[in-house]
Design a protein with these regions (language model features):
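Catalytic nucleophile loop
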Residues: 103-106, 129, 134-154
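Structural motif
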Residues: 6-7, 101-105, 141, 203
Length: 282
């Protein structure tokens, strides 16, 4: 059976026990072998890996059961001097051998997209292997940027103000320059994610950052035609498996439904559905 997805909204704190314990359970329990992908972080891979490994061990994972995937932004190296740079690097798929779970950390989902997906949009060897393992039962978890990458259509960046005042972009073309400019009103970017979560667009940090408008716009403009959005609050996650979704943690998951919606003008919609789910809700 296809493995579970643990999709967390970032800043896991009081909900840590419930969220990470479920990830460990879905990955096989204390003896699970976990691969940690810190690709989104952009820097300090060893420090971030050690933090995640400690958090998982605190929630019951056996000591030494985590390993680091050395796949980072081009100028980053870990303490061993490693960086495989791309999911097509020779021998990279061997890092997935024997694992029962993988955790994607937060940061910038751009780096994950660039490392795991080829420029033409096809899967790298690493992503193709990861897909096959997930179909066989591998659990995939992630928080913040590690949640954003889960959906087929991904919010790559942007803000509510960007929806109102900037043209929506449908690729990461020119993104590095955009980051250097650091505009106060970044545009909404809608692009392809890794595609593990099949039900709609995922957004995160939802209770702490103003993101409702950008999620509505992303659903409404979704090139795949899916019109549902799943907005995860901080310190909250949902577990998805076999068509069923259950909320974990301290906050809420909001389901945005634009299937019957219409746009009045830019930033104004009619008939948008909004449903709130809390811990234990399915």
């Amino acid at each position: 059976m296809e493995g579970a997805l643990i999709v967390a909204g970032g800043n896991i704190d009081t909900g840590k026990e419930q969220i990470l314990s479920e990830f460990i359970r879905q990955s096989g329990g204390p003896a699970a072998s976990i691969l940690v992908a810190v690709t989104a972080s952009g820097s300090h891979p060893d420090d971030i890996f050690e933090y995640i490994a400690t958090c998982l061990e605190d929630q019951g994972l056996g000591p030494g059961q985590c390993r680091l995937l050395p796949l980072y932004e081009k100028n980053v190296r870990d303490r061993q001097g490693r960086n495989l740079l791309t999911g097509d690097a020779p021998g990279i798929a061997q890092y997935l051998d024997g694992i029962s779970g993988i955790w994607f950390t937060g940061g910038d989902q751009y780096y994950v997209r660039k490392a795991f997906v080829r420029e033409d949009g096809s899967d790298t060897k690493l992503l193709a292997r990861l897909r096959a393992l997930h179909a066989e039962g591998l659990c995939i978890g992630g928080s913040s940027a590690g949640a954003a990458i889960m959906s087929r259509t991904m919010i790559g960046g942007g803000s509510n103000k960007g929806v109102l005042h900037r043209e929506t972009l449908f690729s990461y073309e020119g993104y590095d320059q955009l980051c250097e400019e650091d505009p106060p009103c970044p545009p909404l970017i809608i692009t392809g994610g890794l595609g593990f979560f099949p039900c709609g667009v995922v957004d995160q940090h939802f209770d702490a950052r103003p993101r409702l408008l950008r999620l509505i716009e992303a659903c409404f403009m979704n090139p795949s035609g899916q019109r549902l959005g799943f907005a995860v609050s901080e310190d909250t996650a949902f577990c998805y498996q076999a068509g069923s979704l259950t909320v974990l943690g301290a906050g809420s998951v909001y389901v945005v439904d634009t299937r019957q919606a219409s746009r009045v003008q830019k930033g104004e919609y009619r008939d948008v559905g909004l449903m709130a789910l809390q811990a234990g809700d399915s």
